[in-house]
Each structure stands twice: as C-alpha cells, then as structure tokens.
C-alpha cells in the first residue's frame, strides 16, 4: 500500500510538473537542491481548488526569484548574533542596522551571496503568502486592489536584498 501511495504521489508530481510554464520549469531546474522546497509550496496550493489564487501567487513569486538574494556566511552570522544582543532596540531600527554590512565594500567581500531560489524554505514562503492574502483580504486600505496589483505590490516577501525575515508578523494584528 505504501509503495502504491509513493508511486501515485510521484506520478501526480511528475504530471503536475509537466503543466508548469517553461519559465517556472527553468527556475525549478536552476534551484538545484532547493527544488524540493519550492515544489512543496506548489504542492501545498495545488491540493484545494479554493487555493487557486494562492497557487498563482506562489508561481509568480517562484518565477521571479532569480536575481533576488541576501548575504550570508560566517561574518554575517556573527554580525546577526551581535545584533541579537540589542534586546531593547525596536524592530525597524534593528532592520536598518542589519543592512549596514551590505552598503560597505569592505564588508561585502566577506559575505556570501545566498540566492532566494537556492535557499528559501517552503514554510517561510507559505507563511508569507498566507499573511499577504490575509492582509489583502481583510485590511480596508486594500479595497479595490486587484490580483495583478496585489502580486506586484503586496505579495513580495522582500523589498531588496535584505535578509529574509518574517516582517509581515510585525504588522499583523
């Protein structure tokens, strides 16, 4: 029974992959070992027809991941640990301080580029999509924002190349 389930799951995944656009396929191929994480997001929103807009949103995000990255490596890890010691520093001030190494060439040489497409985790992306949809559908200031504008302006999980962060949690009630 378990073997049949695995085979069925593999066939469904293989079939659904064949329905992907060439752009999405190219991004999934480029993602390397992180492909499974991205496919988890697509699978998550492929289960229920009520999630069809969320599936389109997840495809939009994944297709647009190439070129988006953050910096990592031992220096950044140490820097973030030091930043974590600032217990009473407001969230937004910490975010500004966190960006300092990105703006100085001397620091940048000590940092590794971590491309979203190769590092982002499914749980993070699903969480961001859920909160974005919740904010889009429940906030009065979003009235009249259609899906295309939502995707472009409200859905993205980052602004530039700042570290990946659960920033939406800081503005959710």
Regions found by a protein language model. Name each.
Residues 17-173:
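N-terminal accessory/pre-domain segments preceding catalytic cores
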Residues 1-24:
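Bacterial Sec-dependent N-terminal signal peptides
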């Amino acid at each position: 029974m378990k073997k049949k389930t695995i085979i069925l799951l593999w066939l469904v995944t293989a079939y659904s992959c064949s329905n992907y656009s060439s752009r999405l396929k190219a991004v999934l191929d480029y993602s390397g070992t992180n492909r499974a994480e991205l496919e988890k997001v697509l699978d998550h929103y492929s289960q229920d027809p009520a999630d069809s807009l969320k599936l389109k949103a997840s495809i939009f995000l994944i297709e647009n991941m190439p070129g988006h990255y953050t910096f990592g490596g031992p220096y950044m890890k140490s820097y973030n640990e030091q930043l974590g010691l600032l217990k009473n520093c407001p969230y937004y001030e910490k975010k500004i301080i966190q960006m300092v190494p990105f703006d100085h060439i001397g620091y940048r040489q000590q940092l590794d580029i971590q491309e979203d497409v190769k590092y982002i985790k499914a749980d993070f992306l699903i969480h961001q999509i859920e909160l974005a949809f919740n904010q889009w559908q429940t906030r009065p200031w979003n009235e009249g924002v259609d899906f295309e504008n939502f995707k472009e302006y409200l859905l993205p999980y980052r602004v530039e190349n700042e570290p990946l962060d659960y920033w939406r949690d800081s503005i959710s009630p």
